[in-house]
Structures are given as C-alpha cells and as structure tokens.
C-alpha cells in the first residue's frame, strides 16, 4: 500500500486552477490565517461530514465490540469480521454511485437524500442487532451503503466550500475536525449509552442527532456543482 500510494503521489500534478493561482501570485503564505474569514464554511463542512465518521465508527468498531462482548449469545470475532468484510463491498459500490449522481444532480441533493435515509436507518436499524446472521448482515450492508453515499461526494463538496487560496486548508481542516467530532468519541459514546440505558436503540438516537446536525449544515451550504472555481 505504501508503494502504491507513493507511486500515485509521484505521478499526480497540480490542478489547472491552482497552477493559475501560482502564476498570478495568489498563493497565500499563511493559509490558516487567511482561512479565518471562512470559519462558517469550516463549521458547516465539519458538521455536514460528522455523521459520516459517526456511522463509520459505530459500524466498524463499536458494533464489533457489542456483537462479541455484549450480545447474548455473542458472535465470535471471526464471524463478525467476516460479515463486515462482505458488507463493506456496499461501501465501495455506493461511493462510486453517489459520486456519479452528485455530478448529475448536485452535491446537496445527493447528500441531503442520503442523510435523511441515514436518519431513518438510525431510528430503526439498531433493533436488528441480535444473534441472527440475516438481520446483522442487513444492518451492516445498509449501514455501509449509506456511509458510502455520505463519503463519496465529500471530495467535491468540501473543497468547493472555499476559494482557491485556502481551498485545501479549508477542506482539510473541515475533514479532520469532522473525524474528531464524529468519529473519535463515537465508540465510547455508544458504549456509555448502552451501559447507562440498557438499550441498544440509544446508539441509534445518537446517530439520529448527528444526522440532524448534518442536515442543518447541508441546508445552509450552497449548491456548488455549477460554480466557477477559477477565483
């Protein structure tokens, strides 16, 4: 993977828009300072992206721990990992699908639709977390499909929130803050909720709150599909 990553990076070139900015001396020396006027865009990008990471860590980390250690009777770790390996295929497929449709229909249309579907999933899907291969596979496959739908367009809509001179800094900061907000504490929060309430459905309510925050942010973000980015 390191060799493949290095090969790809060595063969990548700067975008025409960035090269034009370099030629016109519009590249800033202190991008974080220049990013300050765009703090609203950073926050909107962070909250719009947050549910993606919450869903990822609930599906990929917390649910494994729950199925192996808490569920009665439990799955073995190998059994649950095998189910995750199969269901993650849906993640890859829906990244591809939603990338295509975000170019056709717009980023907001695809993301709002997928986030609404994630909200509905959050409210009902946790009931399927029981020792039943079919229901768990349904939970994982639908969950990873939704995560792919949320993750796919992020490479477009996050950079498109910002002008050229702070585009990478703004997108990178939003992306990584979303990872902290949505992902860093998701397994711990989920475990604490189940422990305190005794109900696995409480994890779904947590995901529903994150979905609502993402929806608010998405409604406030302007559609960017047809914007002129040479500015």
Predicted regions and their residues:
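C-terminal ends and interior cores of transmembrane alpha-helices
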Residues: 116-131
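Intracellular juxtamembrane helix-capping segments at the cytosolic ends
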Residues: 149-162
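Hydrophobic core of transmembrane alpha-helices in multi-pass small-molecule transporters
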Residues: 134-149
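Multi-pass alpha-helical transporter architecture, strongest
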Residues: 5, 9-11, 157, 208-231
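Extracytoplasmic gate region of multi-pass secondary transporters
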Residues: 39-92, 182-187
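A late C-terminal transmembrane helix in Major Facilitator Superfamily
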Residues: 165-197
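Cytoplasmic membrane-interface "Motif A"-like loop-to-helix N-cap segments
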Residues: 104-115
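Flexible cytoplasmic inter-helical loops of multi-pass small-molecule transporters
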Residues: 10-30, 230-231
């Amino acid at each position: 993977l390191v060799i493949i990553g290095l090969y790809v990076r060595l063969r990548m070139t700067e975008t025409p828009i960035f090269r034009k900015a370099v030629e016109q001396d519009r590249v800033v020396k202190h991008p974080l300072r220049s990013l300050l006027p765009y703090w609203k865009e950073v926050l909107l990008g962070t909250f719009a992206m947050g549910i993606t990471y919450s869903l990822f860590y609930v599906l990929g980390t917390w649910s494994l721990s729950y199925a192996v250690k808490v569920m009665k009777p439990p799955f073995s770790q190998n059994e649950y990992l095998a189910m995750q390996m199969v269901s993650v295929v849906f993640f890859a497929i829906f990244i591809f699908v939603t990338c295509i449709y975000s170019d056709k229909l717009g980023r907001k249309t695809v993301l709002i639709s997928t986030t609404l579907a994630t909200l509905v999933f959050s409210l009902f899907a946790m009931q399927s977390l029981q020792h039943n291969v079919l229901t768990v596979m349904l939970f994982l496959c639908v969950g990873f499909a939704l995560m792919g739908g949320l993750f796919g367009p992020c490479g477009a809509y996050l950079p498109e929130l910002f002008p050229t001179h702070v585009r990478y800094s703004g997108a990178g900061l939003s992306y990584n803050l979303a990872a902290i907000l949505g992902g860093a504490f998701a397994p711990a929060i989920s475990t604490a909720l189940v422990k305190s309430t005794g109900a696995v459905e409480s994890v779904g309510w947590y995901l529903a709150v994150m979905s609502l925050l993402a929806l608010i942010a998405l409604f406030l973000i302007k559609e960017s599909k047809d914007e002129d980015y040479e500015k």
